[in-house]
């Protein structure tokens, strides 16, 4: 045990020690250590997670005849239920794509997709800032990979020119909205690059965009009219959609490859049908939340301006607003101060973000009021 204690002590000395907090949730508020605070760190972007009207409508829809609370098995054994197929068909229809496939979480999706679709003769080119789940999927793929500089498409093009001919297939991997900086990938440029090289596929994670962007809330790819051009479009239900699980939209061939070769899908007990039914209920109503999306964008634009005045650094274009302070100690102190003022703000430091870019990751939700965000900004 000594070596493990030393590791923990080292993390503590570097202000990188993590622990699971004891929290009480009350709608938009969180109580921690007897302090009730407005939650400024949630991924519940549309503010649906505590919407009692939605919950009531969902429960009334089923009366007392609820879907099963467990699948008890993998979908490939006895764990498949009609509601899974119903949701996959709805997702594919909304995206106007041939197929969709469900996963237990965004982490499961990103962990399993690339290993299932690559060989030791394949190449992966990933944005430097992609999520840890994508990095883990890349590592499990056992194929060659390079990480291009963040949103630097000249660097990506150079890597493509030097390497594509040496491999049987190439995957370009990116997020659309990046989870720590809140900036947005140029999907149009990525599609154009993909088309210039043979056997090259584009894989985009819309975890922080689904529900929030696009006329129907389908993400940045919808906003930019590029859904049909992206080979694998992945998103989660656990953020703006207030549920659990994830999806990929793709063609039928890729879907069947994933069903046959994706280990996290094959060997995991499927999500409870009850949860999938809730996801269906929310996803079906996604186009109706345009008012929430518009209000969220107004709040976000205001807070981005306020933070930029204080830091002179503002990469964000979205409702994820990084308040970059640099060092760990300053960031921890600022987070503690803001919590004392009644705002649940969390510090983010290395290795989650690059060294000397520790920040408070602020994320806004559509159920916040303009006055609440103004009062918060005054505390910065």
Swiss-Prot record:
Keywords: Biotin biosynthesis, Pyridoxal phosphate, Transferase. Its EC number is 2.3.1.47. Pyridoxal 5'-phosphate binds at residues 106-107, 179, 205-208, 236-239. GO terms for biological process: biotin biosynthetic process. Its cofactor is pyridoxal 5'-phosphate. The modification N6-(pyridoxal phosphate)lysine is found at residue 239. GO terms for molecular function: 8-amino-7-oxononanoate synthase activity; pyridoxal phosphate binding. CDD domains: KBL_like. Pathway: Cofactor biosynthesis; biotin biosynthesis. It holds the Pfam family Aminotran_1_2. It catalyses: 6-carboxyhexanoyl-[ACP] + L-alanine + H(+) = (8S)-8-amino-7-oxononanoate + holo-[ACP] + CO2. Belongs to the class-II pyridoxal-phosphate-dependent aminotransferase family. BioF subfamily. Catalyzes the decarboxylative condensation of pimeloyl-[acyl-carrier protein] and L-alanine to produce 8-amino-7-oxononanoate (AON), [acyl-carrier protein], and carbon dioxide. Homodimer. This is Putative 8-amino-7-oxononanoate synthase.
